[in-house]
């Protein structure tokens, strides 16, 4: 396949080094797309703690680091999009940054990718409005995972993600208060169910790890 074919991969973390289960999957996913299928691979990713862009493997042709939203932006996103308007789950609101979208817009203009992939539900909001062939790689349905955990033991659920650790201890305790957390999780499940179906309809393809996730 000619290297003129391009894929833009939008990710919530770097796909390297292959030090965890998801990173290992992403690493080989990218390697196969580049080395075996011959695509020029452009990656736009946020950084997680410990990520080092200097370790970029050769099969990634271009890497752009996306700026995470500030705490103020996250709070605004949650209040307006998840609580008041109820149009986005917190999984999406916590990763939405207009500055990151501008970078992705520039990448699309410069590279004109044939395919754009959004990794996990938190990245798919960035790819929904392009003319390229769009793939939502959701891995699993978080709404189902949360529902199973809610039915079994809510103590294992943190709907706020790493954002919780950026807040004062007193606020953390309030947000983890069981009645409040049950309400938040139930609302998040409802928003995720709607969003997962909506993004699946808007993208050209949707990928799940297990067939039963797609069947439900």
Model feature map: region roles:
Residues 1-66, 109-110:
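N-terminal subdomain of nucleotide-sugar transferases
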Residues 7, 130-175:
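Active-site proximal beta-strand in glycosyltransferases
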């Amino acid at each position: 396949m000619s290297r003129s074919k391009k894929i833009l991969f939008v990710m919530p973390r770097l796909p390297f080094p292959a030090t965890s289960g998801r990173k290992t999957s992403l690493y080989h996913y990218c390697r196969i797309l580049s080395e075996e299928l011959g695509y020029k691979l452009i990656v736009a990713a946020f950084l997680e703690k410990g990520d080092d862009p200097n370790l970029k493997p050769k099969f990634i042709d271009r890497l752009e680091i996306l700026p995470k939203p500030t705490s103020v932006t996250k709070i605004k996103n949650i209040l307006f999009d998840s609580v008041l308007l109820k149009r986005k789950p917190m999984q999406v609101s916590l990763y939405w940054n207009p500055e990151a979208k501008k970078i992705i817009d520039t990448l699309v203009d410069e590279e004109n990718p044939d395919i754009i992939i959004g990794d996990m539900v938190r990245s798919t909001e960035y790819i929904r409005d392009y003319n390229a062939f769009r793939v939502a790689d959701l891995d699993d349905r978080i709404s189902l995972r949360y529902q199973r955990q809610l039915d079994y033991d809510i103590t294992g659920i943190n709907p706020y993600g790493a954002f919780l650790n950026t807040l004062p201890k007193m606020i953390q305790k309030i947000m983890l208060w069981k009645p409040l957390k049950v309400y938040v999780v139930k609302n998040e499940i409802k928003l995720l169910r709607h969003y997962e179906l909506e993004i699946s309809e808007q993208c050209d393809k949707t990928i799940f790890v297990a067939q039963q996730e797609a069947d439900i």
